[in-house]
């Protein structure tokens, strides 16, 4: 079999945000590229991916996310290929935030040691993550932001869908993503919105787009607060339909806790919200600080701020008072999405791959990972 230039190992399945990024970059690579996805358990996928790497003999292994399966696959192949890690997360800092077990934290520490320490290049999505890595002594770092398809993600006319869902002329606030839940913290994605509506009896409807175990908890929370009829769960939406469902939302939320993991972490939510012309309310953390005007930013105090829903409620009340202005201000944000255009982002990543391939240094040393990974 003819060796390929780049093999992308995606820590998710087809249709995922990580998969979309990998496919986009692969199309820009000068040479053959293969994209391989997760299918089962971490251990089984690591072994299967390693076999694929050995069979394809790529010059570069591109790990999409700093995660066990893709990094372990590279190591199980003997660490013979050049390795690029593309990540928007700081695993260890996040696990410390949610109070994960010592075993999980040790695994994350080992993963970061390999991913940051043995790779030829680390691509991060924001400058704050790059600054953290530089401070830790890792200087083979480039910043390439999250991407968005500006042709596909545009504001849509959704009057009929609003009527169908009982949202006609209602102020709507949306959150899109994977709805996790952290019992030790007492919340997860979207909890601040439910609390804001419930604590202050806001005449506002919440729209949650995505799936995950946190949705059931949000439903229970809304029912306990007496606002269950104001919470609407759209479920998982195909990327091709995402703009339609986001266009249901007058306002969108990007809530990041004020701690090292969140300053490092970026998501595709912000460019997606901007591309669809949604008004964004974000915490004053990370990339949002660099992009948005002060009117869009709220303070968040520490790693878990139980008073934040009250500040959010006041802001949402102000926005609901002049809904037409809020909608117009959201549409004006679309110009900010241009810097996240996927063609530009994919070309930047492809250029980074080319630079790694051009280096004259030898391949990374062989290594093995402990059974704990």
Language model segments and positions:
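Membrane-proximal helix-turn-helix segments that form the acceptor-binding/catalytic region
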Residues: 47-54, 77, 91, 102-122, ...
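Carbohydrate-associated surface elements
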Residues: 128, 147
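Conserved donor-binding/catalytic core segment of Leloir-type glycosyltransferases
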Residues: 7-9, 123, 167-197, 207
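Nucleotide-sugar-dependent
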Residues: 183-189, 240-244, 252-271, 281-291
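A charged, aromatic-enriched C-terminal amphipathic alpha-helix characteristic of glycosyltransferases
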Residues: 20, 303, 321-354
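A short helix/loop element that forms part of the nucleotide-sugar donor recognition site in Leloir-type
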Residues: 154-167
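Nucleotide-activated donor-binding/catalytic signature segment of Leloir-type glycosyltransferases, i.e.
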Residues: 216-243
């Amino acid at each position: 079999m003819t060796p390929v230039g780049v093999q992308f190992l995606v820590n998710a399945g087809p249709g995922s945000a990580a998969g979309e990024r990998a496919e986009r970059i692969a199309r820009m690579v000068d040479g053959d590229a293969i994209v391989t996805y997760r299918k089962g358990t971490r251990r089984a996928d690591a072994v299967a991916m390693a076999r694929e790497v050995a069979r394809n003999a790529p010059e570069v292994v591109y790990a999409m996310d700093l995660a066990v399966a893709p990094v372990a696959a590279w190591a199980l192949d003997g660490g013979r290929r050049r390795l690029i890690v593309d990540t928007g997360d700081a695993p260890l800092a996040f696990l410390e935030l949610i109070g994960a077990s010592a075993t999980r934290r040790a695994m994350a520490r080992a993963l970061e040691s390999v991913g940051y320490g043995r790779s030829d290049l680390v691509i991060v999505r924001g400058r704050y993550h790059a600054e953290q890595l530089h401070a830790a002594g890792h200087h083979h770092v480039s910043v390439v932001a999250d991407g968005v398809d500006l042709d596909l993600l545009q504001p849509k006319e959704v009057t009929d869908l609003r009527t169908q869902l009982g949202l006609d002329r209602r102020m709507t606030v949306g959150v899109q993503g994977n709805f996790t839940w952290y019992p030790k913290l007492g919340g997860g994605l979207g909890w601040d919105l439910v609390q804001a509506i419930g604590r202050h009896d806001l005449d506002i409807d919440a729209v949650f787009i995505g799936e995950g175990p946190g949705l059931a908890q949000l439903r229970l929370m809304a029912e306990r607060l007496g606002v269950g009829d104001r919470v609407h769960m759209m479920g998982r939406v195909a990327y091709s339909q995402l703009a339609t469902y986001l266009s249901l939302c007058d306002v969108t939320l990007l809530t990041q806790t004020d701690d090292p993991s969140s300053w490092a972490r970026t998501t595709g939510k912000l460019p997606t919200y901007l591309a669809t012309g949604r008004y964004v309310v974000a915490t004053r953390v990370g990339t949002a600080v660099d992009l948005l005007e002060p009117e869009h930013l709220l303070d968040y105090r520490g790693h878990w701020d139980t008073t934040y829903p009250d500040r959010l409620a006041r802001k949402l009340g102000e926005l609901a008072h002049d809904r037409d202005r809020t909608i117009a201000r959201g549409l004006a944000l679309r110009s900010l999405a241009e810097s996240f255009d996927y063609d530009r982002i994919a070309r930047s990543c492809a250029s980074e791959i080319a630079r790694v391939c051009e280096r004259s240094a030898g391949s990374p040393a062989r290594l093995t990972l402990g059974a704990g990974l």
